[in-house]
Each structure stands twice: as C-alpha cells, then as structure tokens.
Amino acid sequence: AILGVAIFAAPSLADFHSHPPIHKPPVYTPPVHKPPIHKPPVYTPPVHKPPVYTPPVHKPPSEYKPPVEATNSVTEDHYPIHKPPVYKPPVQKPAPEHKPPVHKPPIHKPPVHNTPSVTDDHYPAHPIHKPQPIHRPPVHKPPTEHKPPVHEPATEHKPSPVYQPPKTEKPVPEHKPPHLPPIVVRPPPTHKPNPPYGHHPRHPPVENTGN
C-alpha cells in the first residue's frame, strides 16, 4: 500500500547542469544616514594627590685627588697613553718593465747655404753726387743811422745806508745738569790723642796704690 507520503526524487547532477539556477542581481539598499549624537564632555575634576616624599640618597664622598701641581706627578688624565707605532711592511712595487731603446733615425736636413752678407767692408759705398751750391750775391744793407748818446741828468745824492751787521743765529744754550747744592770743602778734622788713663780733665788723677 502506498502511504500518503510523497517521495520526491532529488535532482541529479545532470539536471543541475542542464537547468542552472537563475542569477538575480543584488538589490541596492541605500545606506541609512544617522545624525551624530552630540554629547557634552563630562567634566572630571583633577584628583589631588599629595607629593610623595622621597628621602635624599646619601652618597659617600668621592675620593679626594690632589691637583697635579701639588703632587707634581704625571697622570693619564693629563698625558695620553703612549702607544708604540704599528709596523706596516713596505709595499713591494714590481720592477718596471725593461723596454729596449727605440732607434730613431737622424732627421736629414739639407745644408744651409749661408750667403755672404753685403757690408761696407766688402763693397765700398758709392760716392754720393752732391749738386753745386747756388751762388747768391750778398745782400747790401744800408748803414745804420748814427744816434748820439743821450745824456741823462744827474741823479739826486742819496746818503749811504746805515750799516747793519748781519743777523746771527742765537747761540744754543749750553746743556747744564740739574741744580745741585754747592759742594762744601771742609778741612780735615784735627786728631787729638786721647789723654792717658786717669788723667781725664773732668776727673782727678787716680793714684795707683798697688792693691
């Protein structure tokens, strides 16, 4: 007996290739524009925190170094460390290639024929022909008119000028040293011998009793 359940046969792969599915373009849905929601900023007061006390770090005093001038010593701080020079072997250059000398034939130059110079020593100069001077008769000049000498009247007698001796230059003052006090020459002191002991003029003579 056939039940009331209808069994549909599943489509085969051949049916799928013969009837491909219908392609539908996607439906365009415009984007929904949502205005931005403006929210005022929330004020958060600053949190006051008391300063954290950090005790000072105790550092031991650094080692005392006297100056170089006091100790008169040489330290590495003042003078660099002496390093011996680095030995660099000499660079060996190859010997130059020996090339035989190139023979150059001498250049042939034709002999130069020096023509003798024509000078006065070889050929004397020809005499220069000068024309005869033109004879010109002397020009006759009439004698000059004789003029008697003009007598000028005697000039007035002027007295001879007073003799004035020539001006001489002022003598240069003699250079004198600065003013010094006069040197006083005093006579030598008269030396008086000392009186004998006990015969001072202010003291009476002392008698020697022999005690």
From Swiss-Prot:
It comes from the Eukaryota. Residues 142-159, 167-177 have a biased composition (Basic and acidic residues). Its main location: secreted. The keyword Repeat applies. Residues 1-14 form the signal peptide. Keywords: Cell wall, Repeat, Secreted, Signal. GO terms for cellular component: extracellular region. Residues 25-211 are annotated as: Disordered. Residues 25-59, 82-93, 179-198 have a biased composition (Pro residues). Residues 101-111, 127-139 have a biased composition (Basic residues). InterPro entries: Proline-rich_CW_protein (IPR051308). It is found in: Secreted, Cell wall. PANTHER family: PROLINE-RICH EXTENSIN-LIKE PROTEIN EPR1, REPETITIVE PROLINE-RICH CELL WALL PROTEIN 3. Belongs to the plant proline-rich protein superfamily. ENOD12 family. This is Proline-rich 33 kDa extensin-related protein.
